[in-house]
Amino acid sequence: MSEMTPRKIVKELNKYIIGQNNAKRAVAIALRNRWRRMQLNSELRNEITPKNILMIGPTGVGKTEIARRLAKLANAPFIKVEATKFTEVGYVGKEVDSIIRDLTDLAIKMIRLQIIKKNKKHAKKRAEERILKILIPVPKDNWNEENLKEKPEKTIQIFRKKLQEGKLDNKEIEIQIAATPIGIEIMSPPGMEELTNQLQSLFQNLSGKKKNLRKLKIKDAMKIIIEEEAAKLINLEELKEKAIYSVEQNSIVFIDEIDKICKHHSSASNSDVSREGVQRDLLPLIEGCTVSTKHGSVKTDHILFIASGAFQTSTPSDLIPELQGRLPIRVELNALTVDDFERILTEPNASITTQYKALIKTEGVDIIFTKKGIRKIAEASWKINESMENIGARRLYTVLEKLMEDISFNSNEKFGQKIYIDEKYVNLHLDKLIENEDLSRFIL
């Protein structure tokens, strides 16, 4: 992270997101400030809180993608939630505290995978010993590593070498493997997810750690045993401590559709009261409080919150003043143009056109998008967005799916062919779609 300067962060984001430079700069600075803060002494570090961000822009312009890619760059716990899913305390529905509980669960899984990866080499060695125990039997009552060493060294080395070289992969062995706990589905009322989790954990513990005798090929058994041995090397208390620390110091919470919980001036209904209640419940979470989770208490003082909304029927000033103050950095994202659509189709890593080409290539068909064909797809997508609901870059998926429908359906009949997606091909397949979209405006 020390090498990830704001300029480099923006460069990485440019690989996946087209345009929106102001938003990229804002999140890059926010992420770099996380690293800068961690270099300070503990007294000053605790005084510095993250500058939360409010992204304003229409749907499909890259708000969520920017936050998601940022979390991957930081290798930090990240959760995306929709503000409309939550209700004020006392109402039926999810409470905002569940955001932090879910985030902590994600951090536990993330740190667990990191520890397993770190211990994989040691776990593999232990897995080999378990398999060698079966291949070179010794009395069960007396089993230990010393017994294995007492066996002729030459025999052990021969089997170990064959095992490591994969020559025994298809040999079947019988092995004791921990049974998968029976999943018990409990339907809980909204807002009581924590109680459900506790009940599920209780039932799983009551079932005990049973083991099943299974007959498997050595290559399949090795994978399962490595996972088992790696799990045994995990210190649960240390895992929880690391996960909670990661949540408190590095995590990012992305709250989407925050404009939907704004109070509308034109109405004064109970729903507006509830919306304002959700905003007030979010206040302590964003400002900094302690949330109890099943893994321990989590302080939210240094979690970075990124909120976003289209604000088509409201403005950021419709949020309660206290919440506006907790989101000091405001970034406006621009609506996408035809040129943006053209770049989205070709420039990002694993662009949409690259994905379609790779999928159809599996059938032995080469798809070639010409420059004029790409331009026509971009123009068609932009035109439909302007005439209908503007869904931003997501419109490209609709258009391309329609465009590629015939090729996808008949690909087995076109084996070995090269198909050019040019202006003529696009006109032939998309003109009807555009006409239908235009007509639908006049139908009630």
From Swiss-Prot:
It is found in: Cytoplasm. The keyword tRNA processing does not apply. It comes from the Bacteria. One of its GO terms (cellular component) is HslUV protease complex. ATP binds at I18, G60, V61, G62, K63, T64, E65, D256, E322, R394. The keyword ATP-binding applies. Keywords: ATP-binding, Chaperone, Cytoplasm, Nucleotide-binding. Signal peptide: none annotated. GO terms for molecular function: ATP binding; ATP hydrolysis activity; peptidase activity; proteasome-activating activity. InterPro entries: AAA+_ATPase, ATP-dep_Clp_protease_ClpX, ATPase_AAA_core, Clp_ATPase_C, HslU, P-loop_NTPase. Pfam families: AAA, AAA_2. GO terms for biological process: protein unfolding; proteolysis involved in protein catabolic process. Belongs to the ClpX chaperone family. HslU subfamily. ATPase subunit of a proteasome-like degradation complex; this subunit has chaperone activity. The binding of ATP and its subsequent hydrolysis by HslU are essential for unfolding of protein substrates subsequently hydrolyzed by HslV. HslU recognizes the N-terminal part of its protein substrates and unfolds these before they are guided to HslV for hydrolysis. A double ring-shaped homohexamer of HslV is capped on each side by a ring-shaped HslU homohexamer. The assembly of the HslU/HslV complex is dependent on binding of ATP. This is ATP-dependent protease ATPase subunit HslU. It comes from Buchnera aphidicola subsp. Cinara cedri (strain Cc).
